[in-house]
């Protein structure tokens, strides 16, 4: 046992000796090696050191007489004394705890000349390389950390110190002298030690004395020290010139005055209460001016911050009030980019590509870690702000101004159970917008009402012209309510477009007086939409067909590329499995519309116009089997066309009564001549019946049951020569269904010929047959009729006409008669259209 104890004692003695040797010898030696060799080599200057010591038993480290020379000037750096007294609590708390830090006689004399500038760039370059190599480690550290690191530093003292910076090229000469700073502690730990040091701060800035008064409260329930810091109209612009990122052509702080009245509270841990380091007070900036290439991009006459409390230990912040008054932003976009982005890049220290990439990669890690900071903004406001946007990449340049912008936030916080309120108003696009509501940051939730009046698209017309290749002008108004919870959104309200015009050059493509949308609700979570009203008043559409296509195709084609790219993106599994949207429209209407069509691709040019278009649809929805009502009317060819009935979407179904009255063919003669080579001097079309749509075996079947008639017809060829005419042709009891095979029945077909001689009658009938023949490319039918010697009656009547088995038939009509020949011709034409046999013949029943 004695030997064991002796061995243990010897081992302990050796360990103590090694520890003492490491402390007394190794630490000073390592310090000298780093400063006198490594730092000297990096800076290209001989670093000297008078003395350095470390007591391993008291953990006191002292460095004396550190000097870094500067050619032709005072030393770059001199430090008379650095004393650091570490606490043994560092080992138990696994975080640095420093009992005392004393800095005496620190003098930094930075002179920026060409040589020093190159040295700085070289050192920064090495620093950038080091940052890249340590990127993975930094990312892991970012993931692990969730707030401020744990540390505590007590009894801080800085005396007899100064800092000067001179750059003759930039005309900078700043000096901070006679610096004295005493702080009881700076800590993010609840408790570690106590300090009764009275806080103090005093220095001269360019000869102007600045002081902060301190006090100590050593008795009572708390041991507390305070430091009150006051400054009035400090020229921040002069100080900002020292920072290269804030003193370049892209970004320069031209003017700013800082005033502060801040109180630092250092509360020692007593009576079981944790240590606190608190900051409160007011700070303001006045006459802020930020320029880019000598032009102001940001001006801020006044900014005020009233900080209720900032607790670095509990990591809690309460802002009583933040006010920005008279903010002006001049944002410009040119071929070189957006000026504010260039300024932001300059403020960030450059535009190196590696840095954004590193930030992009680290972003997910940062977002994945929840910050422990809690905060609250009791009130914040933006008053009388103006933002101007000029985009010179367009011709003409786009100019948009947000004027008289007022915004306020109240009781916004990190508390997930409490929502704050906000309001915003501004003059925009020639009108005014207003919004107010409640907001919650985490998780994101917003409930707001927004209203816009007398807004105009004129200011954004250059963007619309670039996107569509056409000019759009319109007025806008809206009054909506919206709720946002995470990725789900719901909205309701009204929106109106008025005095809308769409022009290409001097030609108006479309216009309308008013378009209104009244939305009861749309909910992305429920995937439902309930529309109360969609209305379009006095729309006019001017469609023009040319050899290069219809005029509207250019507008559709302008977004084809982006549309194709969008369609090419595969839908996610969630989207594919999501239920279909349900929707309903209480009423949709078009009133007093006009459709004008002009075809310049044919000769002669053909035109047509459909005026007095009116359409009303009610109670249309996606519900299976539901039917809404439809009511349509329009002028057509000097007459009218009306339709009314029921219509459904799922499945497609319709039962609509149709009536066409006195619809003239002459207004469409130009188009008829251009498309078919046949025009019309006269002709009136009438129709009365019922149209139906029904779904059968995933196919939509269309049907018609009613009467058709064509009166006072006079057809001509392209040269104006008459082809045929009749008093009246009618189909009574016409039934058609697009089944397979097609169902077609005519109870009675009549053609009332003009009162003429037999030869003339034969020619008229031959003309009818010739018309059919010319449309199908065959002429023998006309020859057969011309050879027919039987007297042709003035009126041709066919009863019970049917189309069955690929051929037409009628009661009492022989194949050799004029009626039979016409039916045979129609059978051939119908068979060719339906892809059937062309050898069909008529039969007599």
PLM regions: where:
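Flexible, surface-exposed loop regions and adjacent strand-edge segments
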Residues: 115-122, 245, 299-300, 337-342, ...
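Surface-exposed loop/turn segments flanking beta-strands in extracellular/periplasmic regions
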Residues: 121-131, 342-354, 553-565, 772-775
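N-terminal type II signal-anchor transmembrane helix
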Residues: 1-43, 222-227, 457, 798, ...
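Amphipathic hydrophobic-ligand
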Residues: 42-46, 72-86, 170-182, 204-213, ...
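Elongated, acidic membrane-bridging lipid-handling scaffolds
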Residues: 130-246, 359-459, 464, 568-667, ...
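A short linear hydrophobic-aromatic micro-motif
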Residues: 47-51
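Flexible beta-edge/linker motif
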Residues: 53-117, 141-166, 195-200, 263-282, ...
């Amino acid at each position: 046992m004695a030997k064991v104890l002796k061995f243990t004692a010897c081992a302990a003695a050796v360990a103590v000796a090694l520890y003492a040797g490491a402390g007394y010898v190794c630490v000073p030696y390592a310090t000298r090696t780093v400063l006198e060799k490594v730092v000297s080599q990096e800076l290209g200057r001989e670093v000297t050191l008078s003395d350095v010591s470390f007591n391993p038993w008291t953990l006191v480290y002292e460095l004396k007489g550190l000097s870094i020379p500067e050619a032709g000037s005072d030393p770059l750096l001199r430090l008379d004394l650095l004393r650091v007294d570490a606490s043994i609590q560092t080992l138990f708390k696994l975080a640095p705890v420093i009992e005392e830090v004393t800095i005496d006689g620190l003098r930094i004399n930075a002179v920026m000349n060409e040589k020093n500038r190159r040295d700085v760039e070289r050192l920064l370059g090495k620093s950038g390389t080091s940052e890249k190599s340590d990127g993975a480690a930094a990312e892991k550290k970012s993931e692990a950390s969730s707030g401020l690191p744990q540390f505590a530093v007590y009894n801080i003292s800085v005396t007899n110190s100064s800092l000067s910076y001179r750059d003759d090229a930039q005309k900078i000469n700043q000096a901070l002298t006679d610096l004295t700073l005493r702080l009881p502690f700076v800590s993010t730990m609840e408790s570690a030690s106590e300090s009764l040091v009275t806080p103090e701060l005093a220095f001269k800035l360019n000869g102007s004395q600045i002081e902060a008064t301190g006090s100590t409260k050593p008795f009572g329930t708390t041991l507390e020290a305070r430091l009150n810091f006051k400054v009035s109209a400090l020229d921040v612009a002069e100080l900002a010139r020292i920072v290269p990122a804030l003193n370049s052509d892209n970004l320069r702080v031209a003017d700013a005055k800082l005033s502060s009245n801040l109180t630092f509270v250092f509360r020692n841990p007593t009576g079981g209460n944790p240590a606190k380091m608190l900051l409160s007070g007011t700070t303001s900036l006045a006459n802020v001016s930020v320029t880019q290439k000598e032009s102001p991009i940001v001006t801020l006459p006044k900014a005020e911050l009233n900080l209720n409390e900032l607790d670095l230990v509990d990591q809690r912040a309460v802002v009583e009030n933040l006010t920005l008054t008279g903010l002006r932003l001049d944002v410009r976009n040119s071929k070189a980019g957006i000026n504010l982005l260039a300024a932001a890049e300059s403020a960030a220290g450059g535009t190196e590509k590696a840095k954004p990439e590193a930030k992009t990669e680290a972003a997910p890690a940062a977002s994945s870690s929840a910050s422990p900071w809690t905060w609250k903004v009791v009130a914040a406001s933006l008053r009388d702000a103006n933002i101007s946007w000029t985009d010179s990449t367009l011709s003409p340049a786009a100019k948009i101004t947000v004027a008289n912008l007022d915004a306020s936030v109240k009781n916004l916080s990190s508390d997930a159970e409490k929502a704050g309120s906000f309001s915003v108003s501004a003059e925009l696009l020639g009108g005014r917008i207003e919004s107010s509501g409640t907001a919650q940051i985490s998780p994101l939730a917003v409930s707001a009402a927004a209203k816009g009046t007398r807004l105009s698209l004129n200011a954004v017309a250059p963007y619309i012209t670039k996107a569509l290749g056409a000019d759009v002008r319109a007025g806008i108004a809206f009054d909506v309510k919206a709720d946002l919870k995470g990725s789900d959104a719901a909205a309701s309200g009204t929106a109106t477009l008025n005095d809308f015009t769409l022009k290409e050059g001097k030609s108006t493509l479309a216009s309308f007086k008013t378009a209104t949308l009244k939305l009861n609700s749309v909910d992305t979570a429920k995937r439902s939409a309930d529309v109360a009203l969609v209305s379009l008043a006095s729309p006019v559409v001017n469609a023009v067909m040319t050899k290069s296509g219809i005029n509207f195709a250019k507008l559709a084609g302008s977004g084809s590329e982006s549309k194709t790219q969008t369609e090419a993106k595969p839908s996610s599994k969630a989207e594919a499995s999501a239920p279909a949207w349900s929707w309903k429209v209480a009423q949709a209407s078009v009133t007093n519309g006009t459709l004008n069509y002009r075809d310049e691709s044919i000769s002669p040019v053909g035109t047509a116009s459909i005026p007095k278009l009116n359409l009303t649809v009610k109670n249309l929805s996606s519900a299976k089997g539901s039917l809404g009502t439809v009511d349509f009317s329009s002028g057509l060819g000097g007459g009218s066309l009306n339709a009314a009935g029921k219509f459904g979407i799922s499945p497609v179904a319709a039962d609509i009564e149709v009536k066409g009255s006195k619809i003239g063919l002459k207004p469409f003669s130009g188009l008829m001549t251009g498309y078919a080579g046949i025009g019309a001097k006269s002709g009136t079309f009438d129709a009365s019946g019922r149209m139906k749509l029904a779904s059968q075996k995933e196919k939509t079947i269309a049907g018609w049951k009613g009467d058709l008639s064509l009166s006072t017809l006079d057809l001509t060829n392209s040269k104006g020569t008459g082809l045929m005419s009749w008093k009246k042709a009618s189909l009574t009891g016409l039934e058609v269904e697009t089944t397979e095979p097609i169902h077609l029945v005519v109870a009675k077909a009549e053609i009332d010929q003009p009162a003429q001689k037999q030869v003339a009658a034969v020619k008229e009938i031959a003309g009818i047959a010739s018309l059919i023949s010319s449309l199908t490319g065959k002429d023998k039918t006309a020859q057969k009729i011309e050879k027919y010697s039987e007297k042709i009656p003035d009126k041709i009547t066919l009863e019970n006409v049917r189309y069955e088995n690929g051929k037409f038939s009628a009661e009492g009509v022989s194949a050799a008669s004029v009626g039979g020949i016409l039916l045979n011709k129609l059978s051939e034409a119908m068979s060719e259209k339906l892809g059937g046999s062309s050898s069909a013949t008529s039969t007599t029943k």
